[in-house]
Design a protein with these regions (language model features):
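Structured loop/turn residues at beta-strand edges in well-structured enzyme cores
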Residues: 85-88, 228, 416
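Carbohydrate-associated surface elements
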Residues: 121
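A structural motif corresponding to the C-terminal end of an alpha-helix
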Residues: 222-229
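Short linear loop/turn motifs
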Residues: 230-239, 345-349
């Protein structure tokens, strides 16, 4: 098959897809990844580097945008070297990224004026509280589908403009640019030629109207962000320019962009309303495809754009859980309870039950469905017989309990029962957690062949745009489930466990402090 790239607004050329591949870039919270994917949706090669995160004050989370960019380019080079597949055999590039994380940079120099403020950062909680007290919550929710929370980008941009010397004046003069991580990467990978984001990332800023599909002037005014700072919004599967020749000699086109969780939804082939996936990464992120319907949640979830491709926008319900895999990192790095994350499954399974111990990992408050930025992490139910295994098991179980709360909220919002859950992310390889998840939900949990479904989704978006894959049906044929976890827990024990969890959450909420 060949494609005339001129039809995509690119230079006249034809591309023979024989022996070619798609490259996916996944710029996550803890690492950046470059993946080469073949026509069957299989991973041929990968390169990964960790991303350094700083915590300058309690509740503050930052990353160096230049270091993130350098690491992303480095893995692009490394995966070509490892695989022997170079830029002349890359048909297109897709990008997925940690969402909400905010970068502001100078339009002339291209240099960031401050570190990237990461999605987990809670520094803007006082400003958000003030907006809630002013009655702004309904405006934000009705326009964006989101709740007022420090999680989203709007208050982060506002903080940078208010706290960096000269930023307000530069913004007023049109000299500053704002972007989530995808925009920052696209701008730099194209040598400053393309300043754009996609609909999924835009929908996570709390500045984008998901009904009109445009930046919302009322919200820009509410957060005091000039419209001149905002990137162009494009389809998730479409043209984002070519990679600069000093980065990749043959300048492959960037043809797919999506926030990591939407890319994961696409990678799972959740193309139909009601299909649901959960990613167990730094946090847990559960998304349900709701088709062309924007479901207004009454149960603490957010409505967001699920994917925007082929001239059509599909929406999703989402529940964002702030602490999942990061809880395991906390046990290892902060408490030295485990020496490696892989040790957690064995320890958790070494005891027959949780011994009445519950762990609520509200290190950055609680996300869906509670949305309490002031909740505090707790471990409760300890006795003199409690051990290291007790705490590790409670931490593992916390991912499943939080996911249970989100899934039940989804079912209430849409008025139907979810029959199965597709899973990915690093913790989805923890057999203890996946079995406990199936037991709690009382439905099958489907484990994919690869944990890197986010990268697969980004590759699919790029490949569809250039005709590497024909249609969604071809992608569905690529989907491979390697294991299904079936529920075994009795209803009585399930309810006993959930009652203990609900009590633990109640104790962690700010209303109990």
């Amino acid at each position: 098959m060949s494609l005339n790239l001129g039809s995509l607004g690119m230079e006249d050329a034809s591309f023979d897809f024989g022996g070619s591949y798609i490259m996916a870039l996944d710029c996550g919270t803890t690492s950046v990844l470059a993946t080469i994917v073949d026509e069957y949706g299989c991973i041929v090669a990968q390169a990964r580097r960790s991303v350094k995160t700083s915590f300058p004050r309690p509740g503050w989370v930052e990353q160096d945008p230049m270091a993130v960019l350098a690491s992303q380019i480095a893995v692009m080079m490394e995966v070509q070297f490892k695989s022997g597949i170079h830029s002349d055999r890359i048909a297109a590039i897709g990008i997925s990224n940690q969402r909400e994380t905010t970068v502001v940079w100078d339009r002339v120099s291209g240099q960031p004026i401050y570190n990237a403020i990461v999605w987990q950062c809670r520094r803007t909680a006082p400003a958000i509280d003030a907006l809630v007290e002013q009655g702004c919550e309904e405006l934000v929710r009705s326009r964006t589908g989101l709740t007022l929370d420090p999680y989203f980008s709007a208050s982060k941009v506002q903080w940078i403009l208010d706290n960096v010397d000269g930023a307000r004046e530069s913004a007023a003069a049109g000299d500053l640019m704002f972007g989530t991580i995808d925009t920052w990467l696209i701008y730099n990978l194209t040598g400053g030629q393309v300043f754009a984001t996609d609909y999924t990332n835009a929908s996570r800023t709390a500045l984008f109207n998901i009904h009109t599909l445009d930046w919302d002037d009322d919200l820009l005014a509410l957060f005091d962000v000039p419209r001149s700072m905002m990137p162009e919004v494009r389809w998730s599967s479409g043209d984002y320019g070519r990679v600069a020749s000093d980065i990749m000699t043959n300048m492959p086109p960037i043809m797919g962009v999506a926030g990591d969780q939407q890319a994961s939804l696409f990678g799972h082939c959740c193309f139909r309303p009601g299909q649901t996936k959960n990613t167990y990464g730094t946090g847990c992120f559960m998304l349900m495809n709701t088709g062309d319907e924007i479901v207004e949640s009454k149960n603490g979830l957010v409505s967001t754009i699920g994917i925007a491709a082929d001239g059509k926008v599909s929406y999703a319900l989402e529940g964002s859980i702030f602490a999942a895999g990061s809880t395991m990192n906390w046990l290892r790095n902060n408490m030295s309870i485990i020496s490696s994350v892989s040790e957690s499954a064995q320890l958790a399974a070494s005891i027959s039950d949780n011994e009445g111990c519950y762990f609520v990992p509200a290190f950055a408050g609680l996300g869906a469905p509670w949305w309490d930025p002031h909740a505090r992490g707790i471990v409760c139910g300890l006795t003199g017989a409690s051990s290291r295994a007790t705490i590790v098991r409670a931490a593992c179980e916390s991912m499943a309990y939080q996911s249970y709360d989100v899934l039940r909220a989804m079912e209430q919002d849409v008025g139907l029962s979810i029959e199965r859950l597709s899973v990915d992310g690093g913790a989805s390889r923890n057999e203890f957690i996946m079995q406990f998840q199936a037991d709690l939900l009382d439905i099958p949990v489907l484990q994919c062949e690869t944990v890197e479904t986010t990268a697969i989704g980004a590759a699919y978006l790029a490949g569809l745009a250039v005709g590497y894959w024909e249609d969604l049906e071809e992608l569905e044929q690529n989907a491979q489930i390697v294991r299904t976890f079936l529920p075994h827990m009795s209803a009585e024990r399930r309810e006993q466990n959930l009652a203990g969890w609900r009590d633990a959450v109640r104790r962690s909420l700010s209303t109990a402090q």
